[in-house]
């Protein structure tokens, strides 16, 4: 298709209608992919240690299960690198369809993996491979989803709000994952351990089908279409972004530490801490997290909207400060032993994370020039999964084992918050500015 033909095609497109479709497709897609990815984190603390490492001490088995959990995070930057390349060369839409299919396949296959009792250590090995494939798909998803929505935004003044909707998918996916696990938790302990936990993984195939149908019906973004028409695509965008904007890639990863580390402590490690240390039931923890995610995904677009008013960077630094300090309040409430206060701590735990989530998508994506944006935003975003998100449950378990106090974990969260504040301060703020061409000169 020539540049003239591409221009004519988009002249006939109702931009408002396409924006709605793009936002819906992005949000539904990220919800499905995060359901798939976070379902694993929910189940890890409940059953995987018992099923795949039954001969280990319970604490060691839990840490081994979280090690498999970490494999998915190692794969995410690789997925961002691979799909960032295709997203910046072929298009956002094509890359997003591929990520959805890849993640969906891996998640469905998890439900079929035999336990240690059936095939020995091979069960854990297969789980590692599937978790790696799943991580590659999720790693390539975020950058494309945000760009699909943000690059259809009609004005610069609402970009933070528009870009925040794909972020909605993470708490919404966690909400659905916890609902699915809770729904089947009426089974006896042995039944849930034997086959009940597998059903939510099987059900993911239905959601993938819905997401695929929606994504097939959307147009490519006008920003990428112009790049394609003007023949400005980078030859190797995932490599070029490290040459042209290495600082932004690194700062993006560091800026996410205040969100990634506590986020996985509050949503994954809490199942181990809650059942083993607090003596809480599985259903109690799941119910509290369902309330937590409901509050969380309501707050995301509000925080995104506020970033359009007060500035992306300022809003993000407020969120990082909130996140860094909240850990002490969280573990103080858990330490009271009161069921009501424990429930309150869990229910409120995602509010600081979602305060970061709202402005985060626009803050990161706006930092990269359009022809390298999928690669730069995706790789920077997913590198945080290695340095903060993936190791967080493992580090939290190790800190508690060493110090026997939740406050040790709170200090870890505070350190992550400080790092994120400094990183955000060093990023340029592009709020309300034209992002068709991003200035990559030094500050």
Predicted regions and their residues:
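C-terminal ends and interior cores of transmembrane alpha-helices
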Residues: 101-119, 321-337
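Glycine-rich segments within core transmembrane alpha-helices of 12-TM secondary carriers
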Residues: 160-185, 380-392
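Helix-loop-helix hairpin linking two adjacent transmembrane segments in secondary transporters
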Residues: 170-215
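Central cavity-lining transmembrane alpha-helices of secondary-active solute carriers
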Residues: 66-85, 104-106, 290-303
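Extracytoplasmic gate region of multi-pass secondary transporters
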Residues: 41-42, 246-295, 389-393
